Amino acid sequence: PVPVWHPGENDREAAALAVATEILAGGRSALLNREIVDKQRKAFAAAAGYDPFSMGTDLWFAYGMLGPKQTPEAFEKALWATIDGLRDKGPDAAQLAAAKRRMIADEVFAQDSLYIRAKQIGSLEVVGIGADRRDDWLQALGSVTGKDVQKVLKQWIVPARSITGLLQPEVKS
């Protein structure tokens, strides 16, 4: 498990986990897609996720969808190498700025939809954060540094804390 956001207590930690996830998996040009899918061809899709707005703790997860000649072992090795690279070097300034800009823009543009606004308000209220703290989250995202990203990856996203699973389709004879 990884920590979720508790306003005023762990703003930077939760926001840094969210930004790290965005750098790794936020769209086609994200690190996992660029490195594992496009460059190394260890999977035909790769992604990661984290929800900072949960009760208690949450899970940080990553996954890949493999083709016939792609192995789980090769994917997992490439996944950890990509995460290790971000953890060791940190994001470059452009990566960090782009990730934060996308996340903040997504939050702002989500306000154009009554459905999404209601969903966000309800979610924040249900988990005990309170909808009035939404702008605090945007400020927390904006304050994340490259060192913050490295710190949370070193603390939370490490092989010793991971569990690997393999889902395979049922083979019918």
Model-derived regions: residue spans:
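Short coil/turn residues that cap or connect secondary-structure elements
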Residues: L24, R28, Q70, R87, ...
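Generic solvent-exposed, charged/amphipathic alpha-helical segments
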Residues: A20-T21, N33, W80, Q150, ...
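M16 family metallopeptidases and their MPP-like homologs
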Residues: P1-P7, N33-S143, R161-P169
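His/Glu-based metal-binding/catalytic segments typifying zinc-dependent metallopeptidases
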Residues: P1-L31, F53
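In a subset of proteins, long, contiguous C-terminal domains/tails are tracked
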Residues: T145-S173
